[in-house]
Regions:
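Short, structured segments at the rim of ligand-binding sites
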Residues: 1-239
Length: 239
């Protein structure tokens, strides 16, 4: 194919040529990688993401290093080790690639909810990107929003709460906050999260999270079920 303009704001494709097959490796999902790195930072842990490429999310790994995580990369993937309480980082300003991705703003915010100090987030790509904030506040987070700016002041601890996902990345942020909170949190609206993450609950459980799926019964009693048709995720200590 005759394609030009890679790396610019305009890509031109000239037709007319016979195409042939090839072998191509699809690039890894950098936002999914950022989410799992922030999960380790939020709950405190050690994670290795096979196939992840730091060059695709260097602004995220830089923020995690500044927060106190040990992040290393090799030809096979990225490792993040986060054992100590995190510290606040310099202003996080979303920008087009290769700047800080707007889709990683919410999950990094979740990772910094218990950090020492205050972190300023500035959303420069989309409007209404802080819809997850009110739900995080229900879990004990200290966040002030003014227009495009959100200031996150770290707290000593988060507590469990019933919360509702209203969008994909905000829902992922609620799941990460629930990992770090005391008690069991229930997340409604998880269909938003499932739209962008394959088996998020299974992968988090594989990392040691206590996470299960529930569906409200007609009698009003919540029952657990292993099927994929779910309305709620519960994260925390099982009763």
């Amino acid at each position: 194919a005759r394609v030009s303009g890679a790396g610019s704001s305009a890509v031109s494709i000239e037709g007319g040529q016979d195409l042939h097959g090839c072998t191509y490796r699809v690039m890894p999902d950098r936002i999914a990688a950022a989410t799992y790195l922030c999960a380790a930072a939020s709950a405190g842990g050690d994670i290795y993401l096979r196939g992840a490429e730091e060059g695709h999310l260097s602004t995220v790994t830089a923020a995690l290093r500044e927060a106190g995580c040990t992040v290393t990369a090799d030809s096979g993937g990225i490792r993040a080790l986060c054992r100590e309480r995190l510290r606040a980082v310099g202003p996080v300003q979303t920008a087009p690639y290769p700047g800080f991705p707007t889709d990683a703003q919410a999950v990094l915010m979740a990772a910094l909810l218990r950090s020492r100090g205050a972190t300023v987030f500035e959303e420069n790509i989309f409007e209404n990107r802080y819809r997850h904030v009110d739900e995080l506040i229900r879990m004990g987070a200290s966040i002030r929003v003014s227009g495009r700016v959100a200031v996150v002041t770290g707290v000593e601890r988060l507590h469990s709460a019933p919360v509702r996902c209203t969008d994909l990345r905000g829902g992922a942020a609620l799941a990460l906050a629930a990992l770090a909170a005391r008690g069991s949190s229930r997340l409604g609206g998880v269909e938003f999260v499932r739209r962008g993450y394959a088996d998020l609950d299974r992968l988090l459980a594989g990392l040691g999270a206590q996470i299960w799926q529930e569906i409200p019964a007609r009698s009003g009693v919540v029952k657990k079920t292993p099927t994929k048709k779910q309305f709620c995720l519960a994260i925390g200590a099982k009763k």
